[in-house]
């Protein structure tokens, strides 16, 4: 099978890859999938492209997604762990013995990834998870709980390792929402965006963006 990507050193914008209408993407978010060979659509597991009554995968702007990251969709996929059996009898109606089975399917809600989120290679995001702006998800993490903004998490199941900045700095970043700025403002602020000077960036925002 031909590799969708030409190089491991270059990602492709999601806006130029995604064909599934149930995946919503923001500007400049990209997937770097060279080591797995497929486009981003295949990262969204069990997400039906031809139905509009399913949970959506929503990805914000300026997100970086590593090769082989996966987003498990389709709710509980017909498995009820609180029933005597988790087996999806309902989906095997061709077997007469299963004809009275109830539909065990439950939606999990949309999976929502914030803005400026970095998701490492082969991380797995479970159904209905919400990941806050600025979060960092370590490679091969299994994300089973919502992630607060600007947290760094890792492990299986994933746990918070630390926050990227102080609570005050995070509050300023959330107030500024730099990912929504027009490109000319981002261009001028680039030296600050490429630094740890959050207070300086906030000062720029107050003077030139608001």
From Swiss-Prot:
Record carries keyword Protein transport: no
EC number assigned by the record: 2.3.1.28
Keyword hit for Repeat: yes
Active site: 79
Alphabetic keyword roster: Acyltransferase, Antibiotic resistance, Repeat, Transferase, Transposable element
Reaction catalysed by this enzyme: chloramphenicol + acetyl-CoA = chloramphenicol 3-acetate + CoA
SS bond list: none
SUPFAM superfamilies in alphabetical order: Trimeric LpxA-like enzymes
Single GO molecular function: chloramphenicol O-acetyltransferase activity
BP GO terms, sorted: response to antibiotic
Catalytic class of the enzyme: transferase
Family the UniProt entry places it in: Belongs to the transferase hexapeptide repeat family.
PANTHER family per the UniProt record, alphabetical: ACETYLTRANSFERASE (PTHR43300), CHLORAMPHENICOL ACETYLTRANSFERASE (PTHR43300:SF12)
Protein task: This enzyme is an effector of chloramphenicol resistance in bacteria.
Listed name of the protein: Chloramphenicol acetyltransferase
């Amino acid at each position: 099978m031909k590799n969708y990507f030409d190089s491991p050193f270059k990602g492709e914008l999601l806006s130029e890859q995604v064909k599934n209408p149930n995946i919503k993407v923001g500007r400049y978010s990209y997937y770097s999938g060279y080591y797995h060979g497929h486009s981003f659509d295949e990262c969204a597991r069990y997400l039906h492209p031809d139905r509009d009554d399913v949970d959506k995968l929503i990805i914000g702007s300026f997100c970086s997604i590593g090769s082989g990251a996966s987003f498990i969709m389709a709710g509980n996929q017909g498995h009820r762990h609180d029933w005597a059996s988790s087996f999806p009898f309902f989906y095997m109606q061709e077997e007469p013995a299963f004809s009275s089975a109830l539909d065990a399917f439950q939606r999990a809600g949309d999976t929502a990834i914030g803005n400026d989120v970095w998701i490492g290679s082969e991380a797995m995001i479970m159904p209905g998870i919400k990941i806050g702006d600025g979060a960092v998800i370590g490679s091969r993490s299994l994300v089973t709980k919502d992630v607060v903004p600007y947290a760094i998490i890792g492990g299986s199941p994933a746990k918070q390792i630390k926050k990227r900045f102080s609570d005050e700095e995070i509050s300023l970043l959330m107030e500024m929402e730099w990912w929504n700025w027009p490109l000319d403002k981002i261009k001028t602020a680039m030296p600050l965006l490429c630094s740890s000077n959050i207070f300086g960036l906030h000062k720029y925002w107050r003077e030139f963006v608001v």
